[in-house]
From Swiss-Prot:
Relaxes both positive and negative superturns and exhibits a strong decatenase activity. It comes from the Archaea. Its EC number is 5.6.2.2. This is Type 2 DNA topoisomerase 6 subunit B. One of its GO terms (molecular function) is DNA topoisomerase type II (double strand cut, ATP-hydrolyzing) activity. It comes from Saccharolobus islandicus (strain L.S.2.15 / Lassen #1). CDD domains: HATPase_TopVIB-like (cd16933), TopoIIB_Trans (cd00823).
């Protein structure tokens, strides 16, 4: 006789507490990295999205050597958090300000809460928050935990002090078990790669060993922030339609609903859609049956004349900032970038940007250095399972002038979208969506053509220099013959003319070879001859 099955439910907090690896917390090293990452991303979303030049300070301290507990503290100068929202923002899983139809670094309302859950599993210190919204006269402080069964914040302590220093922004400190020696290189790489695409930000990083690294602001130019937009009809399903209807504050007809609640639908398009769906324009939208909602969604999917989704919801890095960051960090001989035009997949707009840096101080390797970004987030882990890596690996770089298997090259790809198709909640690799993969390939080919042109011009220049260097060995003989002819047998004039002609020829070639002086030409000539 079989035992009875016991059925129960889990709160979101309990689920991710039981499955921390799904949120990017499988072990102490990854947990330390993921905590730093989540806090920095929150700080950037609180600054540049709102037109504030970011000043971000990151500190990691070892506070319990025996148990390897680290305290991660990130402070920003962002817009701050309304005090009434702080407990839920840090203590309720799947609660977020980022459930909007625009590009954001965060997506799930999970990140920092996953860090809090992991923290609670291994030690007893609460998360500490200090925040002050812009123009606030108070600085609000909180110490919080998460009630895992109820998925609710537990307020351990709260208070406020007078804001005498005009501070606005947020400070978050989390104590968490970590493995700094194993996480060190990843954390440094994450901050460096973040800095590459945010050269308008200032970062100060103090690690557990006491080392302080300063990343200075290189420009005051901030990319245009994304705007919240209405949903595109091609990207919605039945349940989203029902949510939109339930949230309506006006008693719309079906036609009014389509025109006012969706992008890419005007009066004419609405009439066509309703005719195809067999729905009456004047019927109240809240009276739609389940079957009618299904017909409407199916008509959306079949209709081929929608305008592409608006790109106002997206914020690109921009070609100037990409090249500025690549040049600052890698000091290459050549850097180029491209920002492609907006495209869409499944009704979600997206833009691909690509950059390449070549030569200079870039180390030589068997593979190019690949920098992957999604919504301005560096993707450090799971590189080989990402669609960006796949496209880079499959591209025939020899077509673009890379002739050997030794690469001295950095390849950068940024995908921004209202919905990044991540493979997991850890947000480290992008799935192989056909439309996105094709656009990444087009972007890389376009920027690779710029590299090919540079390499072609460089090779032509090198070949021309070789020819000019070959001419150097004939200068003594040519100058002597010309001097003898011009001097008409006068030995004193022969010597004088020969020196003048020789110097003149050296100077003529110097303009072509870009060497500093004649002695350098002669040195080059001697080395070349040897």
């Amino acid at each position: 006789m079989s035992a009875k099955e016991k059925f129960t439910s889990l709160s979101p907090a309990e689920f991710f507490k039981r499955n921390p690896e799904l949120a990017g917390f499988p072990n102490p090293a990854r947990a330390l990295y993921q905590t730093v990452r989540e806090l920095i991303e929150n700080s950037l979303d609180a600054t540049d999205v709102h037109g504030i030049l970011p000043n971000i300070k990151i500190t990691i301290d070892l506070i319990d050597e025996a148990r390897q507990i680290y305290k991660v503290n990130v402070v920003d100068n962002g817009i701050g958090i309304p005090p009434q929202e702080v407990p839920n923002a840090f203590g309720r899983v799947l609660y977020s300000s980022k459930y909007v139809n625009r590009q954001t670094r965060g997506m799930y309302g999970l990140g920092v809460k996953a860090a809090v859950l992991y923290s609670q599993m291994h030690q007893d210190k609460p998360i500490e928050i200090e925040t002050s919204p812009a123009n606030s006269k108070r600085i609000y402080t909180f110490k919080l935990k998460i009630d895992i069964n109820k998925n609710e914040p537990i307020i351990v302590e709260r208070g406020s002090v007078e804001n005498t220093r005009g501070f606005h922004g947020t400070s978050v400190a989390i104590s968490i078990p970590g493995d700094w020696p194993k996480a060190k290189s990843r954390i440094y790489e994450y901050i460096k790669r973040t800095y590459i695409i945010t050269p308008y930000a200032e970062f100060i990083f103090k690690d557990p060993e006491g080392n302080v690294t300063y990343y200075p602001r290189l420009t005051n130019k901030i990319p245009k922030p994304p705007q919240e937009v209405k949903p595109h009809p091609y990207g919605v399903d039945r349940e989203e339609i029902k949510i939109l209807i339930n949230n309506l504050k006006r008693d719309y007809t079906i036609k009014e609903f389509l025109v006012n609640e969706f992008q890419s639908i005007g009066d004419t398009t609405a009439d066509k859609i309703l005719e195809l769906a067999g729905l009456k324009p004047n019927k109240k939208v809240k009276n739609l049956t389940e079957e009618e909602i299904t017909r409407l969604v199916e008509t959306f999917k079949k209709y081929e004349d929608f305008r592409s989704p608006s790109a106002d919801s997206l914020s690109v890095i921009g070609e100037d900032l990409i090249e500025l960051g690549l040049k600052k960090i890698f000091n290459p001989d050549f850097a180029a970038s491209i920002t492609r035009k907006p495209k869409a997949y499944q009704g979600h707009p997206f833009i691909v940007e690509a950059g390449v840096a070549f030569g200079g101080s870039i180390p030589v390797g068997e593979e190019p250095i690949v920098l992957r970004y999604a919504n301005k987030i560096p993707l450090i882990y799971d590189e080989k399972s990402d669609v960006i890596w796949k496209v880079v690996e499959e591209l025939d770089w020899k077509r673009y002038g890379i002739e050997s298997d030794q690469y001295q090259m950095v390849v950068m790809v940024h995908l921004c979208s209202t919905k990044i198709p991540y493979k997991s909640a850890g947000k480290e690799s992008i799935a192989e969506v056909e439309d996105i993969e094709k656009e990444i390939k087009n972007a890389l080919m376009e920027v690779a053509r710029k590299l090919k042109q540079y390499l072609s011009e460089k090779r032509k220049e090198q070949e021309a220099k070789k020819k000019l260097l070959a001419y150097l060995k004939y200068i003594p003989e040519v100058s002597r013959s010309l001097a003898t002819f011009l001097a008409s047998g006068n030995k004193e004039l022969v010597s004088k003319y020969q020196n003048e002609i020789s110097e003149g020829l050296f100077k003529l070639i110097s303009k072509k070879l870009d060497l500093i002086n004649i002695e350098e030409y002669r040195k080059v000539y001697r080395v070349d001859s040897e």
